[in-house]
Amino acid sequence: GYSGAEFLAGIPASLGGIVYMNGGAGKYISECVDSVRIFDGKIRELSNKECDFSYKHSTMRDIKCFILDVKLRLKRENPQIVRKKIEDALSARSHIPAGRSCGCVFENYCGVSAGKIIESAGLKGATFGKAYVSRDHANFIINEGERAEDVFRLIKYIKQEVYKKFGITLK
């Protein structure tokens, strides 16, 4: 077996999508990316450094391109150990709310969970149209409709309410 990306198990995303936004859970995909091959009018290979990874960001977000493939830096590991790490990651994600969402919406604030801040502001269940703050995890917005506008309006409302109640600007 190969080890290094087990933390991604259970995240509802394609490899290209998770690289595009430097996704992850506890760790980020950038920690195991060697290079990314893209098409932006021509085929190019970007090194990890050229991808300019940061929190929920990569170069691919700044340029119009398709991610063709990704080379990962993985290491050989006992398959049973890899399997256990995957099971642990899946178990940790078993509490993630079901439904159509983009995962966590806001960054944590100074080490405090954005979900806890939103919950403390009394916003679990807040709705705009068919988008609502999950009752299971307040940093998830579930969209049962087709309108992204509902989600954007709800995000704006959450930011305003959290700022009013706590003086915190969620990002």
Residue positions per predicted region:
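Anion-binding (especially nucleotide phosphate/pyrophosphate-binding) glycine-rich loop
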Residues: 1-21
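N-terminal glycine-rich flavin-associated loop
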Residues: 1-2, 28-45
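DPxDG-like acidic metal-binding loop motif
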Residues: 20-25, 32
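Short Gly/Pro-enriched turn/cap motifs at secondary-structure boundaries
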Residues: 26-27, 96
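Phosphate/pyrophosphate- and phosphate-bearing ligand-binding catalytic cores of soluble enzymes
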Residues: 39-171
